[in-house]
Amino acid sequence: MISIENLSKSYGSKVVLENINLNFENGKVYGIVGENGAGKTTLFKCIAGLEKHNGAIICEYGKPKDFLGYLQTEPFFFSKITGNEYIQLLCNARNVTNTDIKEKNIFDLPLNEYAVKYSTGMRKKLAFTAILLQENKLFILDEPFNGVDIHSNIIITEIIYKLKEMGKSIIISSHIFSTLNDTCDEIFLLKNGQIIKSVLKEEFSNLEREMKAFTIGNKIEKLNLK
């Protein structure tokens, strides 16, 4: 269980997040949706301890960063580190010993090659594998399906189901509504740095229609397509 209370974040005079209040329970999957620039990634970085902020983040396990697996949109890799070394490095950081990484290479990645030579999708799969093997209790997945092939999307989705079954908390951001509909128990709509709506699974279709309405409006008509 993790609770966010009155979390706010500003860069100078620009307010990015304002009075965010959220509760994430164990064994549930949550979606965060919003336009580009709405503050999703900033919120994730605040939870992960990568950004200073006002407000409180309260967790039953202690500091979130000590048990959090954070899959960033564009994971960072050192230039001279192989895929295998990257996984080992992240596991060592949590005092987790994994001697059979080869057996757990579910995405069939070339682990002996430098990670910086990987494609965007391969990098994301490598980073995802690493945080899975860290034995985390909370997972934040920022656009986990972007740039990843359909086969891997299926695997990622099934892993999310498994993590939920194990009692983990999972927070996902995605612009792919069908995926959120398949995986999430609750979705929060973030707009201009504020949570303006939360909906349970049975109401997802209504949220999708609302988002289309305020996102598209009459923009397509303005094109006057012929």
Question: Which residues does each predicted region cover?
Answer:
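Conserved structural motif at the start of ABC-family nucleotide-binding domains
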Residues: 2, 17-19
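Catalytic Walker B motif of ABC-type/P-loop ATPase nucleotide-binding domains
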Residues: 139-143
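H-loop/switch region of ABC-family ATPase nucleotide-binding domains
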Residues: 174-175
